[in-house]
């Protein structure tokens, strides 16, 4: 579900991009009486089950001329139908530059400049990321759009709501 009102895809000057995605799998563990605590991992994760929620909001505003302010907020939450079946797949990894453009081992990589991708090796089930950028174009040629930017990012990932602290953020400038 989303709303996209950005004026240009390569160098947005105004508009917003707001989206929410939901992913659900069937709750296989509810269909049988199995002892998941003593089960081998290969049997336990034969059928992965989870429900995953992501929210992204980006706003673009022209300050003066081609100087643009971008504000963004991203959030994610991964939950399980059965607490004994917390899969190592589909988790969130916060860090890296975001240039890889793909998911490794069923994990969503949430780019945050200045931090390594695997600073949280097991992945996390909750993440928040906030971003502010000032952008100025050097070339608006559609075949080679080039712009400089100054940015501020803050974000983190947590394993559960007990450890979740929205004010404990890793920052980069």
Regions found by a protein language model. Give the residues of each.
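Intrinsically disordered, low-complexity linker/loop segments enriched in Gly/Pro
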Residues: 5-6, 15
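C-terminal transmembrane beta-barrel domains of outer membrane proteins
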Residues: 14-173
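Extracytoplasmic assembly/pore-lining segments of large envelope/extracellular complexes
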Residues: 10-12
């Amino acid at each position: 579900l989303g709303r996209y009102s950005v004026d240009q895809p390569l160098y947005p000057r105004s508009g917003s991009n707001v989206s929410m995605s939901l992913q659900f799998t069937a709750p296989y563990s509810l269909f049988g009486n199995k002892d998941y605590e003593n089960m081998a991992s290969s049997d336990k994760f034969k059928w992965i089950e989870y429900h995953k929620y992501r929210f992204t909001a980006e706003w673009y505003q022209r300050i003066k001329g081609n100087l643009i302010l971008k504000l963004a907020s991203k959030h994610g939450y991964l939950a399980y139908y059965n607490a004994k079946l917390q899969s190592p797949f589909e988790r969130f990894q916060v860090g890296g530059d975001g240039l890889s453009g793909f998911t490794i081992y069923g994990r969503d990589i949430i780019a945050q400049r200045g931090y390594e991708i695997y600073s949280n090796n097991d992945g996390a089930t909750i993440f928040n990321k906030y971003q502010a950028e000032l952008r100025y174009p050097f070339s608006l040629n559609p075949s080679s759009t080039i712009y400089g930017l100054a940015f501020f990012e803050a974000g983190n990932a947590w394993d559960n709501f007990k450890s979740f602290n929205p004010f404990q953020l890793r920052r980069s400038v």
